[in-house]
């Protein structure tokens, strides 16, 4: 299992557009991928799960990936978070 933590810097947090990009990216991988915020974990392949967390600015999140392509999954998600301006 791999994990990585991030701090969200976008003023609006993880809103619909970047959430969709994260879900689409996570869905490309076979690994089980979860997002944790405030002690609650959701499936990163579920848009409803991601949106239900209400992740705002300055929030600390952790992404967990477990499976055969876990390293690639974490790298791809890190790229999306950066490209979408959610993290530094």
UniProtKB/Swiss-Prot annotation:
SS bond list: none
Keyword rRNA-binding: no
Keywords: Cytoplasm, Phosphoprotein, Phosphotransferase system, Sugar transport, Transport
Domain HPr, chain residue ranges per copy: 1-88
Active site: 15
InterPro entries from the UniProt entry: HPr, HPr-like, HPr-like_sf, PTS_HPr_His_P_site, PTS_HPr_Ser_P_site
Localization annotation: Cytoplasm
Phosphoserine modifications at: 46
Family indicated by similarity: Belongs to the HPr family.
Function statement: General (non sugar-specific) component of the phosphoenolpyruvate-dependent sugar phosphotransferase system (sugar PTS). This major carbohydrate active-transport system catalyzes the phosphorylation of incoming sugar substrates concomitantly with their translocation across the cell membrane. The phosphoryl group from phosphoenolpyruvate (PEP) is transferred to the phosphoryl carrier protein HPr by enzyme I. Phospho-HPr then transfers it to the PTS EIIA domain.
Name of this protein: Phosphocarrier protein HPr
Lineage: Bacteria, Bacillati, Bacillota, Bacilli, Bacillales
């Amino acid at each position: 299992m791999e994990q990585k933590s991030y701090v969200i810097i976008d003023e609006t947090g993880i809103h619909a557009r970047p959430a969709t990009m994260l879900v689409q990216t996570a869905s490309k991988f076979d690994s089980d991928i979860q997002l944790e915020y405030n002690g609650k974990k959701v499936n990163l392949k579920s848009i409803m799960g991601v949106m239900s967390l209400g992740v705002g600015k300055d929030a600390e999140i952790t992404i967990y990936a477990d499976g055969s392509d876990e390293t690639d999954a974490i790298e791809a998600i890190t790229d999306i978070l950066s490209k979408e301006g959610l993290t530094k």
